[in-house]
Amino acid sequence: MKLTQRLSLRVRLTLIFLILVSITWAISSFVAWRKTTDNVDELFDTQLMLFARRLSTLDLNELNAPQRMAHTPKKLKHGHIDDDALAFAIFSADGKMLLHDGDNGQDIPYRYRREGFDNGYLKDDNDLWRFLWLNSADGKYRIVVGQEWDYREDMALAIVAAQLTPWLIALPFMLLILLLLLHRELRPLKKLAQALRFRSPESETPLDAKGVPSEVRPLVEALNQLFSRIHSMMVRERRFTSDAAHELRSPLAALKVQTEVAQLSGDDPLSRDKALTQLHAGIDRATRLVDQLLTLSRLDSLNNLQDVAEISLEELLQSAVMDIYHPAQQANIDVRLQLNAHDVIRTGQPLLLSLLVRNLLDNAIRYSPQGSVVDVTLHARSFTVRDNGPGVAPEILTHIGERFYRPPGQSVTGSGLGLSIVRRIATLHGMTVSFGNAAEGGFEAVVRW
């Protein structure tokens, strides 16, 4: 793991701040140094030019007086004598030094090439100087004024340091203010972490996003959505466990009884075979119940459908009728398909829609008397599954589709989950299911979209 990944957010932000400030300060210093150096060079070049022109206004014919060189005063800078501030010398046209400032000027070599600025060195000195050569008005004299480059650079450095030092001094205070601001701004995150640390696994109370930075608020909202889904999942799991324990108690008790009967039958093969047959039927009922419980539990956990496709309801109903044909024939029930619309296409999950239709047909066949008819009719915006049985009492209709609800007095075995599965699948596909008694008689289920 990288070192930066082990550091806290506060330390990371502080390091980033220090790096950015250091880079900014370095770039600003470099730019200020270059700009100040250019300005200082321009200023001192102007000063050299003015000084040289003032020297050219002197009566240069009296320059042969030796006492002038002995009493030439030094240039003052900021009230202090500075030997490196300026130096000058005056030469004749043939290169003879006639006058100098009594200090560095006497070491200026005669290397006149043309009027203007030039760089060079003093005699027996390795420091670079800036020189300005100027001719007198009559052309008899060569005036040279010079200044050491180091002096200019020191001056530029002093100016830049005076400008940037306050920022460098202010850096610790800026860092302290940053740490205080980070501590205040990260306080909601600490509270959030503490709330998560002591949160009950079963709690559905959303996290308080008050004071949380806008960049972190989507994370808090996502966590609240996750907690809501987890709570819903736990509720479903508890309901599934409770339903399974409640509904499997009776079938398992019946299986135990049939097992005991088979054991007590002794040498009576008829009793033993009857008990084993009922045991086999009970196992089938328990298996069907468990399958339906698992199916309903999986459907409850779904929020979005996966592997959806364009489905032809005409082909879907035809396939479902063909699949149910053999069980219907065994029950002496005729299943008829009527297509009042063609090319009806819906987007959905093929297996789930097949399960929806199969459960409706299975329910119709289970509760229809022998010799009856089950009609499946497809319309443009719905399809209907109707039997011609006795129908359902009005007070019972309101409970049809509830989990584990079975009308009282029924001789047909079942779990009461088939129509609940139908309703859940329809909801996932944006459909509605209604149950009622048909005008022509019998019970009907209508699926609309």
Swiss-Prot record:
Keywords: ATP-binding, Cell inner membrane, Cell membrane, Kinase, Membrane, Nucleotide-binding, Phosphoprotein, Transferase, Transmembrane, Transmembrane helix, Two-component regulatory system
Residue ranges of the TM segments: 13-33, 162-182
Subcellular localization(s) per the UniProt record: Cell inner membrane
Domain HAMP: from-to ranges: 183-235
Taxonomic lineage: Bacteria, Pseudomonadati, Pseudomonadota, Gammaproteobacteria, Enterobacterales
Superkingdom of this protein's organism: Bacteria
NCBIfam families named in the record: PRK10337.1
Source organism of this protein record: Salmonella typhi
Gene3D superfamilies: 1.10.287.130, Histidine kinase-like ATPase, C-terminal domain (3.30.565.10), Sensor protein qsec (1.20.5.1040)
Protein name: Sensor protein QseC
EC number, UniProt record: 2.7.13.3
Catalytic activity entry: ATP + protein L-histidine = ADP + protein N-phospho-L-histidine
Residue stretches making up the Histidine kinase domain: 243-449
Name of the gene this protein is made from: qseC
SUPFAM superfamilies associated with the record: ATPase domain of HSP90 chaperone/DNA topoisomerase II/histidine kinase (SSF55874), Homodimeric domain of signal transducing histidine kinase (SSF47384)
Main location as per UniProt: membrane
